[in-house]
């Protein structure tokens, strides 16, 4: 080892010494040898090191303009290795480039602690690096024969016992020593969090690095650190005795002193090649650097021998470990049975005795190669790699982790290949078959006398098959019966979020003091985005003139004097509400263990008469809970349910083209993609189908279920498994090919979003009109009636035809409107729901799994939600039951049987509904998601009819939207006039309908639309909002123009007329 102004500090007995010129260089493993030790103090199994490390070290150097090394007290601070090579540098100015060696002649010392003398160096930092030096019994004798230079530290000599007489003589002199030729004992390198252990890398007969198959003690070769190969050892010993030469060397290296507080390390290139004379070498496959990299380290490529560093003023310091990889984890003492001494930087760490053992610690995978640095650049600090937010990357990482979790085994690791797709295919087929049997047993037996007359043995055989699959299900369906007079814990304060909603929508603050004079910045080309949340600077009873005056300051002073722009934040969930709900349902649900304590039962209301359905308490109940299951409503209102069967629907419009989602059926308790990997991805392939063809497909599916029931009930116990496999194979073979789908997997066709428009389905719509007014899709006062356009599936009725295993992924309703889902049957559906106040946590979890919050393509893990304290409502919706999903409730649904569901949205005319929709508007704008409900247009249309003027909270929420949008139109008109843009009435230009959406962000554009088009409209024109940047491809050969739907005069008249009575 060599270095400039570096020294080796250690302790022997009670004596302390310092060896100047020592610093770590390269280390390598060598094979055991029975040769005579070539150097005094070496064991017979030890040989000099061949500098043939498999990884090119990054050399470091210390500038010449440095102070001399400091002296140290051996007190209460622990020292380690300070090196910027393979070992990370210890970031402490006092100990840079110093190697602490703890050696006691023939007797092991358990620990060593030191501290710097200087008071300015007391804040010694901890580090992860440490070097253990072991197995050199006669190190002191070797140093004596080498005439080493020692520096005594008498203040630390107190409790070590008898000293070696030979060594006492040595510490009284300060003779010279060429320390770069001194051979050190075995060195093992480790870190706190990740150990790099030389003992677990064994050089076999073919010189290939391998790892022992177990962690039992293995005799390993010793590691020596020197400056050359075997053929240079004699030269090394001769140089040690050359005191004059060493004295001159040391004086040259200490001419310039080190600074008191800082040492600058500089990397310099060092030749790092294999030794010709050594029997141990590295092949091209062992090295982690390319041939070109090796040439750059040895430009002339003259010799493969290690070239000792010159005695120039530049100091080179390198350390390497032979081919340490992630699979090389092991215990230091298992592989190195001889005495080892710990030297670390953590003063609180326990001492390490000679017979102590360590548990193997996995080694971190090596990252990217460090780029080569110049000699003047400081070393690049190691930093944690930035966490990528790319959804595809995150999704692949999650899938890989889930795949590795499936391969875990309690015993020793086994090499086996798992085809997850085959396992998933078998599990899917078995689960589907079990659900088919349940469907036939529970729902079809009433229509088929042959099924009812099954013998008991055949019935038991079917029940046994069903039971073996039900045992593996963790359904935990929870329902709690409630009455019309039930009072919820959050009655009048929906989910304890009223303060949150009011703060975002109806809060007024004092505007900031305006600066004097006009602003010198340029006038913006377009106004800022129209946001509906944040505190207002104007009160809700202001006039339109006050709004226009405040908005005029944007052009003159470049400030927004209407409202304060604040970034939207999700609500903070009130955990006390969860405790109150547990107490409310405690009598009915008592099996909530620690793991299931975050489960909430679904309140189920059973109605029997029409009076109960039309009572005020019925409406109050539905608008209080997050989600409510209603039983008996169809019978109480005498609704003709048979009109909603699939055959009847197909008769009304047989040629109707419907959307089909092709999915792989599976249990609702988990989720796998089509390749069998556990993840959150919902695999669906879209296609089209005529309604009459889909009706025939559903009939075929039901017939297959009947056939499976007959076959399994007739087979014996021995034939059961083979019969099931045959049925599953026949099902896959009989299915039609689906474009983009794996034909070896079982697929189902989910008929989704079948629009029941009144002109084709008048009979069905007449039955829906029997419901209470607040549940009707087109009721008076329903906010969605004022959207100005028909939004399919929102203010229209849709039907969903579901075979077994159909999935509706997790989602919130558009603009967080409430929704109604009526299960016509005959089968059941499984529902999952999460209350509104947890949408912030859900958004974060969804992003961590590589999905976007608003994309309906994921199936959340029930287990993960419960572990993170997110309440989950899970229940089973039976035939002819209606589920009312309140505003903002996050939910996902799966059919466990054949079902027909009828669904639509309702916009309840209350503050909670309007406020949550306003929050959703800004959230959609921030994340670039399309809001299907044009909320701003909806508010102005409702204001035209002077709705909700007598409801104080609804009035304030409405006026807040109107104030902001009126000011935005004023901003736009002012900027158009200032820049002299082309503008015209939308009716004159005849470009499009009134409700427009931005081409980029898909957000609603209120009143004024930006276009890039031609005079003759020969090219397609796209609308753009005020804040999106338009690409050049939409500007080329086109001109900019604006259209408006409402003049300022029209908006002012509506605004001033909307006042309380």
Curated annotation (Swiss-Prot):
- Source species, please? Caenorhabditis elegans
Q: What is its EC number?
A: 1.14.11.-
PANTHER family, sorted: LYSINE-SPECIFIC DEMETHYLASE, LYSINE-SPECIFIC DEMETHYLASE JMJD-3.1
Lineage of the source organism?
Eukaryota, Metazoa, Ecdysozoa, Nematoda, Chromadorea
Under the heading InterPro entries, the entry gives:
Corepressor-Demethylase, JmjC_dom, KDM6_GATAL_sf, KDM6A_B-like_C-hel
Cite the record's tissue specificity text.
Mainly expressed in head and tail.
- The ranges of region (Required for binding of unc-3 and for function in Y-to-PDA transdifferentiation) come to 418-759
What are the alphabetically sorted keywords of the record? Chromatin regulator, Dioxygenase, Iron, Metal-binding, Nucleus, Oxidoreductase, Zinc
Q: Mutating residue 1001 to S: what's the consequence?
A: Disruption of Y-to-PDA transdifferentiation
Reported phenotype of the disruption mutant? RNAi-mediated knockdown results in abnormal gonad migration with aberrant turns and positioning of the distal end as well as in disorganized accumulation of oocytes in the proximal gonad arm. RNAi-mediated knockdown also results in disruption of invariant Y-to-PDA transdifferentiation. RNAi-mediated knockdown suppresses mitochondrial stress response mediated longevity. RNAi-mediated knockdown reduces lifespan of floxuridine-treated animals.
Family membership, please give it. Belongs to the UTX family.
Record's function text: Histone demethylase that specifically demethylates trimethylated 'Lys-27' of histone H3, a mark associated with transcriptional repression, thereby playing a central role in the histone code. Involved in the transcriptional regulation of the heat shock response, unfolded protein response and possibly other stress response target genes. Required for gonad development and organization. Required for the robust transdifferentiation of the Y rectal epithelial cell to the PDA motor neuron during larval development.
UniProt gene name: jmjd-3.1
Impact when changing residue 903 to F? In fp25; loss of demethylase activity and disruption of Y-to-PDA transdifferentiation
PROSITE patterns, per database record: JMJC (PS51184)
Cite a single Pfam family from the UniProt record.
JmjC
Assembly and partners are described as: Interacts with wdr-5.1 and unc-3.
Essential cofactor(s): Fe(2+)
Q: Where along the chain is Zn(2+) bound?
A: 998, 1001, 1025, 1028
Where are the annotated segments for Required for nuclear localization?
369-417
What effect on the protein does mutating residue 1028 to S have, as reported in its record? Disruption of Y-to-PDA transdifferentiation
Biased composition (Low complexity) is annotated at 310-320
User: What's the name of the protein?
Assistant: Lysine-specific demethylase jmjd-3.1
Q: Name the Gene Ontology biological process terms.
A: regulation of gene expression; transdifferentiation
GO CC annotations on file: MLL3/4 complex; nucleus
* GO MF annotation list: chromatin DNA binding; histone H3K27me2/H3K27me3 demethylase activity; metal ion binding; RNA polymerase II cis-regulatory region sequence-specific DNA binding
């Amino acid at each position: 080892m060599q270095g400039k102004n570096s020294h080796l500090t250690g302790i022997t007995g009670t004596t302390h010494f310092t060896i100047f010129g020592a610093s770590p260089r390269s280390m390598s493993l060598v094979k055991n040898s029975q040769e005579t030790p070539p150097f005094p103090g070496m064991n017979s199994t030890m040989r000099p090191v061949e500098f043939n490390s498999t990884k090119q070290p990054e050399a470091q150097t210390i500038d010449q303009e440095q102070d001399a090394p400091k002296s140290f007290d051996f007190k209460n601070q622990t020292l380690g290795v300070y090196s910027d090579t393979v070992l990370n540098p210890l970031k402490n100015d006092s100990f840079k480039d110093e190697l602490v060696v703890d050696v006691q002649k023939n007797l092991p010392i358990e620990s060593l602690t030191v501290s710097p003398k200087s008071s300015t160096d007391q804040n010694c930092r901890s580090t992860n690096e440490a070097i253990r030096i072991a197995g050199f019994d006669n190190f002191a004798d070797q140093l004596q024969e080498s005439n080493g230079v020692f520096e005594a530290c008498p203040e630390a000599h107190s409790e070590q016992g008898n000293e070696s007489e030979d060594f006492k003589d040595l510490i009284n002199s300060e003779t010279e020593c060429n320390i770069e030729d001194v051979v050190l004992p075995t060195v093992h390198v480790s870190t706190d969090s990740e150990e790099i252990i030389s003992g677990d890398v064994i050089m076999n007969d073919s010189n290939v690095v391998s790892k022992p198959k177990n962690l039992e003690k293995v005799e390993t070769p010793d590691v020596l650190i020197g400056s050359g190969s075997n053929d240079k050892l004699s030269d090394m010993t001769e140089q040690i005795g050359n005191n004059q030469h060493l004295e001159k060397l040391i004086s040259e290296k200490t001419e310039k002193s080190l600074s008191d507080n800082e040492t600058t390390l500089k990397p310099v290139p060092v030749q790092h090649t294999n030794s010709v004379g050594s029997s141990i070498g590295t092949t091209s496959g062992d090295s982690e650097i390319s041939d070109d990299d090796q040439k750059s380290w040895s430009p002339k490529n003259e010799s493969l021998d290690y070239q000792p560093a010159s005695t120039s003023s530049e100091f080179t310091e390198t350390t390497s470990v032979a081919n340490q990889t992630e699979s090389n984890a092991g215990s230091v003492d298992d592989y190195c049975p001889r005495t080892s001494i710990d030297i670390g930087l953590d003063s609180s760490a326990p001492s390490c005795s000679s017979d102590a053992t360590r548990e193997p610690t996995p080694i971190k995978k090596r990252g990217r190669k460090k780029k080569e640095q110049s000699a003047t650049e400081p070393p690049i600090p190691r930093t944690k790699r930035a966490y990528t937010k790319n959804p595809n990357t995150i999704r692949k990482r999650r899938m890989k982790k889930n795949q590795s979790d499936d391969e875990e085994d309690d015993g020793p690791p086994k090499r086996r290949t798992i085809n997850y797709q085959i396992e998933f295919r078998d599990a899917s087929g078995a689960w589907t078959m079990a659900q088919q049997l349940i469907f036939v047993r529970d729902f079809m037996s009433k229509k088929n006398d042959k099924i009812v007359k099954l013998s008991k043995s055949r019935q038991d055989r079917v029940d046994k098959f069903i039971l073996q699959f039900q045992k593996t299900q963790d359904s935990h369906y929870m329902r709690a019966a409630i009455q019309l007079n039930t009072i919820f814990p959050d009655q009048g304060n929906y989910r304890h979020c009223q303060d949150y909603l009011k703060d975002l929508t109806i809060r007024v603050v004092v505007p900031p003091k305006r600066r004097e004079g006009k602003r010198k910045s340029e006038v913006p080309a377009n106004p800022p985005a129209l946001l509906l949340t944040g505190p207002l600077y104007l009160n809700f009873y202001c006039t339109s003139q006050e709004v226009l005056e405040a908005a005029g300051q944007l052009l003159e002073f470049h400030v927004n004097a209407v409202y304060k722009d604040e970034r939207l934040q999700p609500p903070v969930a009130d955990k006390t509400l969860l405790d109150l709900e547990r107490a409310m349902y405690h009598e009915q649900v008592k099996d909530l263990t620690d793991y299931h304590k975050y489960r909430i039962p679904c309140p189920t209301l059973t109605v029997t008469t029409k009076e109960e359905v039309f009572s005020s308490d019925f409406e109050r109940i539905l608008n209080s809970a997050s989600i409510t299951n209603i039983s008996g409503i169809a019978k109480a209102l005498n609704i003709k349910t048979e009109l909603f069967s699939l055959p009847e629907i197909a008769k009304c419009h047989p040629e109707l083209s419907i959307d089909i989602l092709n999915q792989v059926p599976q249990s609702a308790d988990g989720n796998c993609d089509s390749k069998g990997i556990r993840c959150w991805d919902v695999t669906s392939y879209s296609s089209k189908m005529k309604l009459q063809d889909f009706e025939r497909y559903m009939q075929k599916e039901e017939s297959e279920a009947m056939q499976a029931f007959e076959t399994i009930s007739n087979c014996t116990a021995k034939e059961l498994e083979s019969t099931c496999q045959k049925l599953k194979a026949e099902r896959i073979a009989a299915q039609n090919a689906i474009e983009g789908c794996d034909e070896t997997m079982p697929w189902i066709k989910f008929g989704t979003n079948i629009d029941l428009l009144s002109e084709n389905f008048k009979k069905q719509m007449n039955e829906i009109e029997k419901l209470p007014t607040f549940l009707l899709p087109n009721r008076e006062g329903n906010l969605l009636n004022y959207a100005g356009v028909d939004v399919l599936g929102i203010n229209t009725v849709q039907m969903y035809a579901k075979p077994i295993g159909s999935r509706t992924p997790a989602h919130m309703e558009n603009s967080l409107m409430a929704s109604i889902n009526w299960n016509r049957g005959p089968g059941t559906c499984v529902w999952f729901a999460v209350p509104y106040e947890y949408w912030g946590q859900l958004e974060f979890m969804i992003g961590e799994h590589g999905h976007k919050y608003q994309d309906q393509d994921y199936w959340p893990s029930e287990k993960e939600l419960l572990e993170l304290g997110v309440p989950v409502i899970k229940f089973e919706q039976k035939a002819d039951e209606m589920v009312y999903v309140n505003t903002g409730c996050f939910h996902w649904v799966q059919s466990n049987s054949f079902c027909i569901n009828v669904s639509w949205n309702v916009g309840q005319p209350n503050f909670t509904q309007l406020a949550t929709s306003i929050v959703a508007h800004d959230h959609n704008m921030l994340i670039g998601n399309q809001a299907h409900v044009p909320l701003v247009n909806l508010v102005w249309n409702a204001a035209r009819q002077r709705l909700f003027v007598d409801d104080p909270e609804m009035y304030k929420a409405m006026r807040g939207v109107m104030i902001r949008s009126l000011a935005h139109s004023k901003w736009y008109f002012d900027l158009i006039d200032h820049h002299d843009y082309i503008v015209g009435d939308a009716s004159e230009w005849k470009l499009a309908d009134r409700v427009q959406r931005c081409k980029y962000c898909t957000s609603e554009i209120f009143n004024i639309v930006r276009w890039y088009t031609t005079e003759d409209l020969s090219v397609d024109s796209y609308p753009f909002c005020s804040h999106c940047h338009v690409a050049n491809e939409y500007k080329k050969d086109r001109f900019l123009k604006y259209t408006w739907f409402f003049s300022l005069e029209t908006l002012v008249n509506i605004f001033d007329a909307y006042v309380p009575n």
